[in-house]
Amino acid sequence: MEQKEFDIKNILLKIEKDKNETSKKIQEKYKDCTIEDLEKSLRIQNKKSEEITFISKKIEELNEKLIVEKYKPLLSSSNNSNEIENEISPKIKEILIKNSILKNENSAVSPSITTTDASASLSFGGKTIVLPSNQPTTLRKSDAPADTKHIKLEITNDNKINIIWQDAKNYQSKDWVALYNYKYAPPDGYVNNTWYWAGNKTSGKVETGVTYDANRTQQVRYYNYQNELISQYTVESQCWIDIHGDLGSGLQVNWPNYSTSGSNDIIAIHNSNFGEPKDLANSIEQCYANKNDGDWVSEIINCGLPYYAVYWSNIGGGNYIKQACSKPMTPVDRKLAIGEYYNGEDSYNTSVAAFYDSRANDDKDYIMVTLKEVDQPGTPGYNAKAANGIVLSSNHSSYNDTLYFWGTYCSFDNETGKFYIRQKSCALEYRKWITDNYSKLKDRKVRNLVLPGSHDSATYFINSLSPKSPDADHYKYPDYLLTPWSKTQTCSVYKQLCFGVRYFDLRVARLKDKLYIIHNFYSDSVKQVLKDILQYVSENVNEVIILHWSHLYLVDEDNKLLMKMIIEILGKFMSNSNKGPDVKVGDLAGTPIICIYDDLVNPLSNGGAGGNGKRPDIRDPRLWDPSCISSPYETSRYHSFESILKFLKSRINVPKRKVLHVCQAILTIEFSYEFFGHDLITWTVEHRNKFNEFFNDLETFASPTNIIMTDFVTFYPLSSYCIRRNTLEFNNSN
């Protein structure tokens, strides 16, 4: 998380640095220019808005400098300074006051005035829009004597623009007025030659014939015979624009007043990861603003990127200004996760798997799988669209000895023309995910957490040479057919814990003088599994771990031996069963292991199914009764993906007892199925995406979920899924 924040900070610093460098370049470019040079430069096409703004401001500053240089000696040395002051135009007087050449006689008066004239209501199309009662003009008090050149914009019922100004008969014949459709236009940037003489030979009103476009800012200005801006009146744009669309569907853009939009105005869709778009040229699709009735369904498919819609106004000369910009669409989390795949006949032939949301990936998106973290997009790796939700690295022996490998999702930013890192994930993120989110989870009941679980958790050592165990006596098939369906995990219990798995299904039988984990065949020793758990819990004392011992093929002496081994190795980390199924995460601090000991399903013990149903008299209180967990499943019925999914869906809305609950997303083998030439790994890979869709539906509809148990648990993005659900549910509850 700290790395992501560091990346964002660096990006913001880079943007600010680029902005400062651009500003310096513009200043250097125009530092020695005259007013004439600058005005000429304004007429050159394809200038960016920041450059236009700088030039306009520079012209204004140079004009002010000339005025100050002209009048300062006259007013400071002349005996006729009062006469000179009276002859100075209001605009020049304002500049001299600003530069402390003249005193401001109206300094106690508010610097702006507000029109209360009836023209503050705009009438067009038979409708009236009342502007705010305090609609300001840009007139200054010092510019507003009794005969002020107060200019206004009027919109007629047929949606045409008139310009009105006061007391024309008192003004110079060479004064003039003009109409502009954006605020920062140079003096000669008026609309379609709509400038008019405004002096003593006019009526103070002109009908421009220009259609009012509510999507543009409209401005009228009054200039004196020296081309000095005296007053102006602005009607702000009423333009807005919106972009939306479901993931995988065409993006839809809406905007108002399309019928009066300029025929050369453009609606554009942008993909920008670094703030509002700045240039029409970087858009990914366009349409004309006066088309599509203001409702445009683009051919661009929503791939979950930060899309913007922008209304670009044509200001002539091939130049455009941004009239309105939508809020960005929130980028869709690709649900990037890291897993580990087993390939081949031994568990040391391993690939790193990068899982991600397979819906609507952009053609340019790609995934990198690396043994170290990357800070910049590298050589494009696996195409995200083609890979359809999962990429597997090439086999790499280094993956067996480390969790420090990364998946990196890269997308393209059209605004900058570069790839950027959209999301990163590392297997180490799951190592202590409960501890990392402890403040959010400590008050949650364990039965209300969503937890990854592994089915027949310690079967990673099963191979074609493994001896058959007592639970396989009813199968009368060769070992080479049965072993591929008996191995359900490829990672050790310690590595599963590091991958974020928190529920373990453990079955036990004796072989010679040792107790082993079994599933049709003998796998790793119980002692080694307990040592794996001890190693992990010693490093992570707040990570909730649920051990479910069941299907115990043990005589009474072995049953007691197993309980003794568990207590001796893990005892100090085991919580007391009197805490019950309502136990909260915080209640397990320091003793995070819930050890459920189900010795009823035991055909060899007097206390099990083969005996009198009575348990041993002595039972440690740290061994939880199996009544604290529910794990519904019918092994005789679910032998295909369709039947399993139907069962799982049927259980979603069944009221659940207030105990731990297991969702068994697993297959039970039945030889009526065509198993020859198949194995459980192949079946899991074939149906993995369908199970993921089911899990995603549980998330979408916030269906109550506790433990999700699967075969080959690292083949699924379950840990990141559970982290997301637990933290999101916490955020929603707050």
Swiss-Prot record:
One Gene Ontology MF term: phosphoric diester hydrolase activity
UniProt key word Coiled coil: yes
Highest taxon above the source species: Eukaryota
InterPro entries in the cross-refs: PI-PLC_domain (IPR051057), PLC-like_Pdiesterase_TIM-brl (IPR017946), PLCXD1/2/3 (IPR042158), PLipase_C_PInositol-sp_X_dom (IPR000909)
SUPFAM superfamilies linked: PLC-like phosphodiesterases
UniProtKB keywords: Coiled coil
Protein known as: PI-PLC X-box domain-containing protein DDB_G0293730
Organism: Dictyostelium discoideum (Social amoeba)
